[in-house]
């Protein structure tokens, strides 16, 4: 049976085992790893797990998101004495009472406290993208480490996951809810074959997948990221790739196109890609590789027109078509530049560029304890370390950190979009629980969460000359996940700061000792340092180049990836954190903070659409953007009666309320940039929570509380018998077009919305 282990328990006690290759800043606080123990589990436990798996499989086309049941079953067993309060239901014509809300909240927090880890964070599924596991399996296959790293049980669960998320037409999407794409279909087909599935295995599923691929143009029509993965594997030729010259890293930084000016996720993915392209690295050509060459193309492999294939992309994948200027650039580099740099004397410069690229790869690896900023560059960096030296210590140090990314649920084993969302979820959970005015009842929960947040703050900048490594300051920041990951993020720092400031207002005998003042000042310093000249805040760093650089975006599947754009979410979070800090520490950098808040609020108003909406770039979508837009403006001092932006924002949200109450927004809003209801106009508890929080903050209860009452009824009636809330459609997004799971949101936002509703709507009505 699978068992989730947390923190120091994830490390093998035998130092000769993988634990000897792990380093940590804080005894692995926040680390979450699934282990398989064949001796664990009673027959009843195993039957319960099997039933959950079967139920998911039977309903996989109607409900594509797992409910994270394996983790919940484990925590339920560990907290077997837990008995919740009786369930509450509110009839359609019945008023929502404070008693009903309070009992719902107690039931919700009681349950949510049972799935909190001992170190204070809330573990959960952060999967969703369907292109992550293939990169891992391809890398492990090339390096010969597949069976050593992924046990038979790991491989079985990965296959389960892929079969469960295969679409009816035989293909796979970019993410679990998306229609089939060539990128998803080819990579997941290849993954199954590398894991030992035969071309006719899977009850016809593999054959059906191959048919989808061939019917839609074959692997020659895969996206550029897919072409790269197939090239290193040996089932596609490097001649069919558009160039990624590593010499870009030798250019002067003053050039707008220097990689150091790109969004960190973009540059950290293309960094190892440059290395692999520059070396024209190809793994061993084995019988399975030769077989895949025959299976994936419409013509014999040696007859594929690789030059034509460079710019081929299946229409199903084409979210961001290449502009003409890009095609001209790639053609020039391919036909003129690359032939020169593959031969002496220019090849000497290529070798120098490759050495420089590897230095940056090693810097990233070492400063994230080999976790890396995300799963794509994690496995690419690992492959580069092996390509540089198959026996290197760097390669061995990468291996144990693979497990930080793997998560298992009833739908199988997936690779997460980060090493988790630990800090982010914990900071939100703290704010949600405190909003209920029931904090004193949850001393243990809040004390543990407080400790996690304190333990996860980044305490030092990265070593060396930050400018040379293109890094921003990080001392005082909070990361998205764990301190060992360590990349600083503007909104994570803001939400972490908001949480510890709220906790500092509660008695220390309830929530533990407050964080040191200097660490608060350090966090404020990071936030202030991240404001752009337009007043907005981007994610990890300042915006370092121009929007026109997006013309060079080579990834057909994603939008807005080249530079770190300012966002309503990051700008709002910064305002809220600084405004909260200013109330408690009015003498610290007051003028800078006031100016920062004013400029950020002006920025938020400037990017509001004419219909009153804000596009949410990290959640689905206009309800998420609206929540941040409204809360940011209110925190900056704007009010409904003196701010037209707030009035328009409220009108927009109210216009999207469903007839029966609540809000339900589809992920299609993100990719199409038009508000779209979920199929059948169903409410979603997370969208409903965001909209409620927005309207409450904007004073809706003083004008007409009816929409809030209807929404509260939706949330109360959605609660499950044990106090949990149901997992509904996917609610996270990145780069406009790829969805990602935030499994904790199903608990956090009903609690938060009902908490604010109880304290700010119902109580004042008394």
UniProtKB/Swiss-Prot annotation:
Keywords: Isomerase, Repeat. Belongs to the terpene cyclase/mutase family. It catalyses: (S)-2,3-epoxysqualene = cycloartenol. Its EC number is 5.4.99.8. PFTB repeats lie at residues 155-196, 520-565, 597-637, 646-687. GO terms for molecular function: cycloartenol synthase activity. It is an enzyme of class 5 (isomerase). Oxidosqualene cyclase involved in the biosynthesis of cycloartenol. One of its GO terms (biological process) is triterpenoid biosynthetic process. One of its GO terms (cellular component) is lipid droplet. This is Cycloartenol synthase. The active site is at 491 (proton donor). Pfam families: SQHop_cyclase_C, SQHop_cyclase_N. It comes from the Eukaryota. InterPro entries: SQ_cyclase_C, SQ_cyclase_N, Squalene_cyclase, Terpene_synthase_CS, Terpenoid_cyclase/PrenylTrfase.
């Amino acid at each position: 049976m699978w068992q989730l282990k947390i923190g120091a328990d994830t490390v093998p006690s035998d130092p000769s085992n993988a634990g000897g290759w792990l380093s940590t800043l804080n005894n692995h606080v926040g680390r979450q790893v699934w282990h398989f123990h064949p001796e664990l589990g009673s027959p009843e436990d195993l039957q319960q797990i099997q039933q959950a798996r079967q139920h998911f499989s039977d309903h996989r086309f109607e409900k594509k998101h797992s409910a994270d049941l394996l983790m919940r079953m484990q925590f339920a067993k560990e907290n077997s004495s837990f008995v919740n309060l009786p369930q509450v239901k509110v009839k359609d014509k019945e008023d929502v009472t404070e008693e009903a809300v309070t009992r719902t909240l107690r039931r919700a927090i009681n349950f949510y406290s049972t799935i909190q880890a001992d170190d204070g964070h809330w573990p959960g599924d952060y999967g969703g993208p369907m292109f992550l596991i293939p990169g891992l399996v391809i890398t492990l296959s090339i390096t010969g480490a597949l069976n050593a790293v992924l046990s038979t049980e790991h491989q079985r669960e990965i296959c389960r996951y892929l079969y469960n998320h295969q679409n009816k037409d035989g293909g796979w999407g970019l993410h679990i809810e998306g229609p089939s794409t060539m990128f998803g279909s080819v990579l997941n087909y290849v993954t199954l074959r590398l894991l030992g599935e035969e071309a006719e295995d899977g009850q016809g599923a593999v054959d059906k997948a191959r048919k989808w691929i061939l019917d839609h143009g074959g692997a020659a029509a895969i996206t550029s990221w897919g072409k790269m993965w197939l090239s290193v594997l040996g089932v596609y030729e490097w001649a069919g790739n558009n160039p990624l010259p590593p010499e870009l890293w030798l250019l002067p930084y003053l050039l707008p196109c220097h990689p150091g000016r790109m969004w960190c996720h973009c540059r950290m993915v293309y960094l190892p890609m440059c290395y692999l392209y520059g070396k024209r690295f190809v793994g061993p050509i084995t019988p399975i590789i030769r077989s895949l060459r025959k299976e994936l193309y419409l013509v014999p492999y040696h007859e594929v027109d690789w030059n034509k294939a460079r710019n081929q992309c299946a229409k199903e994948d084409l979210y961001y078509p290449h502009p003409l200027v890009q095609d001209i650039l790639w053609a020039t580099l391919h036909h003129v530049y690359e032939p020169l740099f593959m031969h002496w004397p220019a090849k000497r410069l290529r070798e120098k560029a490759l050495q420089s690229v590897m230095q940056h790869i090693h810097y990233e690896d070492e400063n994230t304890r080999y976790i890396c900023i995300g799963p794509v560059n994690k496995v690419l960096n690992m492959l580069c370390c092996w390509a540089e030296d198959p026996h290197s210590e760097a390669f061995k140090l990468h291996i144990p950190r693979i497990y930080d990314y793997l998560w298992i649920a009833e739908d199988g084993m997936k690779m997460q979009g980060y090493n988790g969302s630990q800090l982010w979820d914990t900071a939100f959970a703290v704010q949600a629980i405190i909003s209920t005015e029931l904090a004193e009842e949850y001393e243990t929960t809040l004390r543990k969460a407080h400790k996690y947040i304190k333990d996860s703050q980044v305490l030092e900048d990265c070593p060396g000359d930050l400018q040379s490594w293109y890094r921003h300051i990080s001392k005082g920041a909070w990361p998205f996940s764990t301190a060992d990951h360590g990349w600083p993020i503007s909104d994570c720092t803001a939400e972490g700061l908001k949480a510890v400031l709220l906790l500092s207002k509660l008695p220390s005998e309830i929530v533990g000792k407050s964080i040191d003042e200097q660490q608060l000042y350090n966090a404020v310093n990071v936030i202030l340092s991240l404001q752009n000249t337009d007043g907005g805040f981007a994610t990890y760093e300042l915006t370092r180049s121009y929007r026109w650089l997006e013309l060079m975006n080579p990834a057909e599947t994603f939008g807005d990836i080249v530079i770190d754009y300012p966002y309503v979410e990051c700008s709002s979070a910064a305002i809220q954190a600084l405004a909260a800090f200013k109330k408690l520490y009015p003498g610290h950098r007051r003028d800078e903070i006031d100016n920062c808040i004013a400029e950020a609020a002006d920025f938020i108003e400037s990017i509001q659409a004419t219909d009153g909406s804000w596009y949410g770039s990290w959640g689905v979508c206009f309800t998420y953007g609206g929540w941040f837009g409204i809360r940011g403006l209110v925190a900056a001092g704007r009010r409904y009666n003196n701010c037209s932006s707030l009035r328009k924002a409220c009108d927009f949200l109210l216009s999207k309320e469903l007839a029966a109450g609540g809000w339900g927004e589809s992920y299609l809003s993100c990719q199409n940039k038009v508000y779209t209801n979920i199929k059948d106009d169903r409410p979603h508890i997370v969208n409903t929570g965001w909209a409620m929080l927005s309207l409450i903050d904007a004073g809706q209860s003083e004008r007409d509380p009816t929409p809030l009452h209807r929404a509260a009824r939706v949330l109360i009636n959605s609660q499950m018998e044990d106090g949990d809330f149901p997992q509904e459609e996917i609610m996270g997004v990145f780069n406009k077009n790829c969805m990602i799971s935030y499994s904790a949101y199903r608990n956090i936002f009903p609690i938060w919305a009902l908490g604010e509703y109880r304290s700010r709507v119902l109580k004042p009505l008394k």
